[in-house]
């Protein structure tokens, strides 16, 4: 393990030198590529350097054990240093796990109302607000790509692009069925209703990855409409694109310009096609090894939001929090971090079993 890290540390030093070369700085695509590689290695190299420093201090304290006057102090420091060594070894093992190539990407977030009618649409709006607030906390940018509003509020469907640092890494475990239990405002008897929404988190596709043949596209234009179906635009600015080979359909009517709507729809379409291809690949890998860590099966119920109890439970990791108001305002870092830690440990176990 440490031989591999030594090689990576040498590569890290090479990258630091390259990033200071004027010709590299002038070549922006190459500079960005090397910068990403440098950033990817920074955490590991820094942890390894701390680890080497702790090992040197442990060795020095062991030498002091032979000195009667220094023995007691050396033993106390040695205990703390050995604890640090163990923690750093665990951190380094996590940092050595194969990185999801999509982790640094922007995402296409799709939220759809499911069972529960109007209440489900209202909850879709609540979820979108929650993720938007979380994005603000992380200084991410949120851009609505398309939205189908419900007459009583919320969304039948909302699709948004979220741009920023490590967006997919933090949001990828949000894909799945989110269930809500609460008393609707229209419920006179005070009975709790259960409804659900589905959330999909797709890594944004880059143009170079998805090459779509124009022949495979059916493009329809129509007038944009608002809640209830009334037309809100006299020109045919809304766009519906169908990818004939896969049957994927994307609609966009958010902008007044047909060109802008077409551009947004194509961005969503490419991301959905890329996600489908990656899911097929993941399924093949899972079948080969009989196991898939963090499959993100979208058909399963992953989380319940119980408003009368002020409770949120994530069923995958058994995490229950009784501060639902704060969570719905985007304070979900604890949930996100717990999920990432859980699936990292699952990956470590799988790696150990395969060794």
UniProtKB/Swiss-Prot annotation:
Coiled coil: none
Cytoplasm is among the record's keywords: yes
GO CC annotations on file: cytoplasm
Record note on modification: Methylated by PrmC. Methylation increases the termination efficiency of RF1.
Positions carrying N5-methylglutamine: 230
MF terms in GO: translation release factor activity, codon specific
Keyword terms, alphabetized: Cytoplasm, Methylation, Protein biosynthesis
Cell compartments where the protein resides: Cytoplasm
Top-level division of the source organism's lineage: Bacteria
Family assignment from sequence similarity: Belongs to the prokaryotic/mitochondrial release factor family.
Role description: Peptide chain release factor 1 directs the termination of translation in response to the peptide chain termination codons UAG and UAA.
Protein name (database record): Peptide chain release factor 1
Species per Swiss-Prot/TrEMBL record: Geobacter metallireducens (strain ATCC 53774 / DSM 7210 / GS-15)
């Amino acid at each position: 393990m440490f031989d591999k890290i030594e090689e990576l540390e040498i590569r890290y030093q090479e990258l630091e030198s390259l990033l200071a070369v004027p010709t590299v700085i002038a070549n922006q695509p190459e500079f960005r590529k090397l910068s990403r590689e440098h950033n990817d290695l920074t955490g590991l190299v820094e942890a390894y350097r701390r680890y080497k420093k702790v090992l040197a201090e442990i060795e020095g304290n062991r030498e002091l054990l032979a000195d009667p006057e220094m023995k007691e102090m050396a033993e106390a420091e040695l205990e703390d240093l050995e604890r640090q060594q163990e923690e750093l070894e665990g951190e380094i093992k996590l940092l050595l796990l194969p990185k999801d190539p999509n982790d640094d990407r922007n995402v296409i977030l799709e939220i759809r109302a499911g069972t529960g009618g109007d209440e489900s649409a209202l909850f879709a709006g609540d979820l979108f607000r929650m993720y938007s607030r979380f994005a603000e906390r992380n200084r991410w940018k949120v851009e609505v790509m398309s939205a189908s509003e419900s007459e009583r509020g919320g969304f039948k469907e909302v699709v948004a692009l979220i741009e920023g640092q490590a967006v997919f890494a933090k949001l990828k475990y949000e894909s799945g069925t989110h269930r809500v239990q609460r008393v609707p405002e229209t419920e006179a008897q005070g009975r709790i209703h259960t409804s659900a929404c589905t959330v999909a988190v797709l890594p944004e596709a880059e143009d170079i990855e998805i090459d779509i043949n124009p022949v495979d596209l059916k493009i329809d234009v129509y007038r944009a409409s608002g809640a209830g179906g009334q037309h809100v635009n006299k020109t045919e600015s809304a766009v519906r694109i169908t990818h004939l080979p896969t049957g994927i359909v994307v609609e966009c009517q958010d902008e007044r310009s047909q060109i802008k709507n077409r551009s947004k729809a194509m961005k969503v379409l490419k991301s959905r096609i890329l996600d489908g291809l990656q899911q097929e690949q993941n399924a093949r890998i899972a079948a080969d090894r009989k196991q898939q860590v963090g499959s993100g099966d979208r058909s399963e119920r992953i989380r319940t939001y119980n408003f009368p109890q002020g409770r949120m439970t994530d069923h995958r990791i058994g995490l229950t929090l009784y501060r639902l108001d704060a969570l719905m305002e985007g304070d979900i870092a604890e949930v996100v971090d717990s999920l990432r830690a859980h699936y990292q440990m699952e990956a470590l176990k799988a790696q150990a079993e395969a060794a």
